[in-house]
């Protein structure tokens, strides 16, 4: 093994150094403080769990993203968490077991087998909130509003929010009666927004059929006006689709009222999380970045696998990515340099200052250190027997 092999990190894995580490931690604290001011209680799930609980209700995508290992105590397969949402659902359904509304928030590292996008690598710092026990639109609005507030705290300008509803695609596919291979191919083409491929797969579908509506729907996206286009395409399709469109319209009206500065859009090809989302889904974007900076939605069925079905909605985001994209000012106050003198009065002054300030104490063998190189803009100086703080010239 060469010397370089000893310090080389795996692809997509990085050390986070000062001052970036300080900016990330500052935002993490502010995001969690914001969530807790909205009534969300902090939970700290374990880094590893048995695969059965990590994959509950999440579909195949999360399994591909999860590092797996064998438990040396039991021989069972375990996984390093790739998403904390299933863990929060387990805590609500089984560990807490509360009736009524439960609000939980979390923040911590997750590990992915492959990077999802260039800003995160394979070790994102995920934060999120989950609201359990309410299937109301008010709960959906609370979660979306909190997500937008956390993005404001992160200093993200000019937000765009896309809304979608899983029931629309789900109902059309059910009515179409595709075989398994065709359904998988249509899903893949819709997720990639490949209109030519959908035309090839569904080109023989007659007007008015579910397949024909899917082809037309893939061409619809944009602002509030696109909702009217979708209504025209989906007119008479099913009661479930009408209800989903009505809900999208109501939520859009509330968002326009409460967040007029956020541009709204509808993306009827949005299928991320289709395997576990059950209703309204949403994703926030910023100009110049193609991936969502935060996303979430309703997932009412996931708790049933833990023995207690509960309506649920929530969102998650990556703190590391937000720091890279945001315009949040970060200015760490300068520290105070204290000499290495063995003086009881100096010890008392340092102890008092450390209640509110950062004090860096010199060591006997670093008397030549320049305090400004250690981030100090002030120093403790003995003036007539009194230790006072003075600005470093």
Curated annotation (Swiss-Prot):
| Record flagged with keyword Amino-acid biosynthesis | yes
In its UniProt record, a GO molecular function of this protein is: histidine-tRNA ligase activity
Q: What is its main location?
A: cytoplasm
| Biological or metabolic pathway of the protein | Amino-acid biosynthesis; L-histidine biosynthesis; L-histidine from 5-phospho-alpha-D-ribose 1-diphosphate: step 1/9
Q: List the GO cellular component terms.
A: cytoplasm
What are the UniProt keywords, alphabetically?
A: Amino-acid biosynthesis, Cytoplasm, Histidine biosynthesis
Q: Name one Pfam family in it.
A: tRNA-synt_His
Q: Which family does it belong to?
A: Belongs to the class-II aminoacyl-tRNA synthetase family. HisZ subfamily.
Matching entries from PANTHER family are given as:
HISTIDINE--TRNA LIGASE, MITOCHONDRIAL-RELATED, HISTIDYL-TRNA SYNTHETASE
Q: What else is known?
A: This function is generally fulfilled by the C-terminal part of HisG, which is missing in some bacteria such as this one.
Role of this protein: Required for the first step of histidine biosynthesis. May allow the feedback regulation of ATP phosphoribosyltransferase activity by histidine.
Full protein name: ATP phosphoribosyltransferase regulatory subunit
Species, as recorded: Marinobacter nauticus (strain ATCC 700491 / DSM 11845 / VT8)
């Amino acid at each position: 093994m060469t010397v370089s092999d000893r310090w080389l990190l795996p692809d997509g894995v990085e050390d986070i150094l000062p001052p970036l580490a300080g900016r990330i931690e500052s935002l993490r604290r502010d995001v969690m403080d914001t969530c807790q001011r909205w009534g969300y209680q902090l939970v700290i799930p374990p880094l590893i769990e048995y695969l059965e609980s990590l994959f509950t209700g999440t579909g195949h995508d999360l399994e591909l993203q999860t590092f797996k290992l064998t438990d040396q105590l039991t021989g069972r397969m375990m996984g390093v968490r790739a998403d904390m949402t299933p863990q929060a659902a387990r805590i609500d359904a089984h560990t807490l077991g509360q009736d009524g509304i439960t609000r939980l928030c979390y923040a911590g590292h997750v590990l992915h087998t492959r990077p999802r996008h260039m800003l995160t690598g394979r070790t994102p710092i995920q934060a999120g909130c989950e609201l359990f026990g309410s299937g109301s639109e008010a709960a959906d609005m609370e979660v979306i509003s909190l997500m937008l507030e956390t993005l404001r705290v992160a200093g993200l300008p000019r937000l765009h929010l896309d809304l979608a509803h899983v029931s629309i695609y789900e109902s059309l596919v059910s009515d179409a009666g595709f075989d398994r291979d065709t359904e998988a191919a249509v899903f893949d083409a819709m997720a990639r927004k490949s209109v030519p491929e959908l035309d090839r797969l569904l080109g023989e579908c007659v007007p008015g059929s579910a397949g024909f509506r899917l082809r037309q729907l893939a061409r619809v996206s944009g602002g509030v006006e696109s909702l009217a286009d979708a209504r025209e395409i989906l007119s008479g399709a099913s009661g479930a689709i009408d209800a989903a469109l009505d809900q999208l319209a109501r939520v859009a009206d509330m968002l326009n009222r409460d967040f007029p500065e956020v541009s709204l859009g509808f993306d009827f090809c949005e299928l991320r999380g289709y395997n576990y989302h059950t209703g309204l889904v949403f994703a926030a974007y910023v100009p110049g970045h193609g991936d969502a900076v935060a996303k979430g939605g309703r997932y009412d069925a996931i708790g049933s696998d833990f023995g207690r079905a509960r309506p649920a909605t929530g969102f998650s985001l990556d703190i590391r990515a937000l720091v890279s994209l945001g315009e949040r000012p970060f200015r760490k106050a300068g520290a105070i340099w204290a000499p290495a003198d063995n003086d009881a009065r100096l010890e008392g002054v340092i102890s008092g200052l450390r209640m509110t300030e950062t004090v860096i104490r010199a060591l006997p063998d670093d008397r030549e250190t320049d305090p400004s190189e250690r981030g100090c803009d002030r120093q403790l100086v003995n003036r007539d027997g009194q230790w006072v703080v003075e600005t470093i010239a």
